[in-house]
Amino acid sequence: DYPAIRGFDYMNYNPLYGWDDQTTERIIEWGTERNGIPTVCWHINVPKNFANYELGDAVDWQKCTYKPDETDFDTSKAIVEGTKEYEYVMLTIKTLAEEPKKVQDAGVPIIFRPYHEAEGNTNTNGSGSWFWWGKSGAEVYKKLWKQLYTTLTEEYGIHNLIWEYNSYDYSTSPQWYP
């Protein structure tokens, strides 16, 4: 006997230090052989020293982070075409897209929970965020989330994702909802 829902994380599929830890294969097995429902989050990291990062370079995982106070990555620029931050985010999405596409080809739906708990400690300006994706506040976060959604569905044709929004604090979650 197995639980109905099992959680996975696509954090290791990224352009910095990514390695194949067989997450996708385990998701497919869970959905096809055990008739389970996979849920997947995405703890995507950024270089701690983004200013000196060259797009496409590999970076040791210890020099990467998801914490907003450990990086100079400017989240507000991640939604502005032509910036290095935007190009980095688009590269991470491209790297990610290969994995849910394989799961889609296997006929398995995924509950996908990207950019979760962005607001952190109940505010809308990003000052209490736990993750870089919430660092620039609710309005930037919503655009970043929609950028991911649009790119995966329209550019990469991924339609097996059931999109889950996950906030931390109910009192501010309506302001952060994409």
Task: Tell me what each language-model feature is.
Residues D1, D169-Y170:
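A short, well-structured beta->alpha microelement
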Residues F50-A51, S173-Q175:
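Short, solvent-exposed polar/charged micro-motifs at secondary-structure junctions
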Residues N14-P15, S171-S173:
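Flexible loop/turn segments at secondary-structure boundaries
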Residues F8-D9, C41, R113-Y115, E164-Y168:
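Short His-Asn-centered micro-motif
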Residues P15-G18, T23-E154, I158:
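Substrate-binding cleft of extracellular glycoside hydrolase catalytic domains
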Residues R6, P174-P178:
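Aromatic- and acid-rich polysaccharide-binding/catalytic face
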Residues D1-Y13:
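N-terminal regions that are enriched for targeting/export leaders
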